[in-house]
């Protein structure tokens, strides 16, 4: 038989088999657009604005629908009711970590963010217990954040009111807090090694939010066989991990099992029991990836939120003026802000919540995975199916937040000007995979922002109406545009 005919026949059979398999799966899963063989529904998604694509599809297929990202089905949850029902009401079943091939390859299934099953449960339980032992949620951690806020203010004074890009200064503050927890150390804001780490973290966030990385996560074979910016992610991640491995080695040499100093010490003393399935070498690798997770998540999300907050405060000077008026009334000029002040500062609290709602930092959260076969809203979702939760659809719900595209602290104030909580506020996600550092992040945002506004007036380099607050990139994260400002001592 002609080899060309054999090839055509074989490809046709594979094509028909692919169609049959996808058709069979779609009969059980929630509805969704018809996928093409191999590439799935990728042509129906704008990789530069995935959130809008998800919203458009939800208008056709409802709040629970299926997309094929490549050959794999992914269930998308859109809107508060669907997200809450899955992550809270069926929290255990939706607690798996979905596939994110770039980070899956970098972490090898270890750490606290991208691990699964018992590895994740044990690591998260150990991490939360250890963080509490180290002062998380207590006065001692507040003292650390207050001291770092003082250092941040002093560093901003050194700019002498000249124009500056706040990216790395704002990154240093939360990074120093998490460093003090992980390995009981902090860095000078001008330390070259420290700034190099900040740069690598910032670069990872930017690259992970590019369209190319969205394509790579859909077609992971590209990671191994194509050149591209994904290799920079692996290189930067390895540099950060190796830096932390050196810290781990230093701790091994100076460890006193009777007096644990920090997270690394606690893990070296007790972590092996929690992660006993790993050989020693892999336990150290697991520790390195766990502290890399804490280091990265504890730095980049908070620093990006702080940076975006300053941009919005420059854009809306009337909001800044109200916050500074409240700071003057409650705290004054000479006392440092503390967490007890927050309950007496409803407008400031509302402003910070509105920043987090408006910037929609991680629009689709990290992917989840169902841990068992589950019947959800009369649909059957098989074990191992990827699930995307559109946090953007919750944070920008027009019934809960009228005019959601508008930055307005009034979204979190009642008619009497008191702070108003909202169940729809879930920038840290919700359920069993909620961010482990949520409490610390909230503390840092309040203390850092109030300390800055207590000591400085923010001066833009252009007229406020000309300031663009549109994200530079929207992918894994919403990345703010680069900008400069002047910190004028008040």
UniProtKB/Swiss-Prot annotation:
Query: Which CDD domains does this one have?
Result: CYP2C-like
Q: Which family does it belong to?
A: Belongs to the cytochrome P450 family.
N6-acetyllysine: which positions carry it?
A: 249, 375
- Tell me what this protein is called: Cytochrome P450 2C50
SUPFAM superfamilies listed in its UniProt record: Cytochrome P450
The protein's organism comes out as Mus musculus
Q: Which ranges form a coiled coil?
A: none
Q: What induces it?
A: P450 can be induced to high levels in liver and other tissues by various foreign compounds, including drugs, pesticides, and carcinogens.
